[in-house]
Amino acid sequence: MPFGEYQYSLDDKGRVVIPAPFRDFVEDGLVLTRGMEGCLYVFPLDRWKKIEEQLVNLPLTDAEARAFVRFFYSGAHKTRMDSASRVLIPPPLRLFAGLKEGGEVVIAGAPGRLEIWSQERWWKAIEEVLAKPPAPEALKGLVG
């Protein structure tokens, strides 16, 4: 599982370098899509196939399920790292995540995925957790 956080700049073509510790995780291809809290999720292809299997089984009669699938699946973009370990982030996904050419980007590991954040949104998300940390009971059995 990928973990850690790394800062890079988005180049003038909308590309970002995948950090060396994460490259093996996505070496066979990846899918970029909209994530929660205004970030992008990056899934390796094998993980994405499992997610697709779960999405196809969501009930069409459930409006919330349809809305989530629309949000999550319609924004998906399959790609690969180039020879310099960069990934092109399509303009609609850059817009969604608030990523600007030349701007600072945080790439963070998470269980089963990577997350790509604008630096500003990343620190806002971290500050929100610090301002209102989860109750110890919610973490029972997970930490410690």
Curated annotation (Swiss-Prot):
CDD domains linked: MraZ_C, MraZ_N
GO cellular component: cytoplasm; nucleoid
MF-aspect GO terms: DNA-binding transcription factor activity; transcription cis-regulatory region binding
Residue ranges of domain SpoVT-AbrB in the record: 5-47, 76-121
Keywords in alphabetical order: Cytoplasm, DNA-binding, Repeat, Transcription, Transcription regulation
Pfam families cross-referenced by the UniProt entry: MraZ
Major localisation: cytoplasm
Keyword DNA-binding set for record: yes
PROSITE patterns named in the record: SPOVT_ABRB
Localization per record: Cytoplasm, Nucleoid
Alphabetized InterPro entries for the sequence: MraZ, MraZ_C, MraZ_dom, MraZ_N, MraZ_sf, SpoVT-AbrB_dom, SpoVT-AbrB_sf
Source organism, top-level taxon: Bacteria
GO annotation terms (biological process): negative regulation of DNA-templated transcription initiation
PANTHER family associated with the record: TRANSCRIPTIONAL REGULATOR MRAZ (PTHR34701:SF1)
Quaternary structure, from the entry: Forms oligomers.
Family: Belongs to the MraZ family.
Protein name: Transcriptional regulator MraZ
Organism whose genome encodes this protein: Thermus thermophilus (strain ATCC 27634 / DSM 579 / HB8)
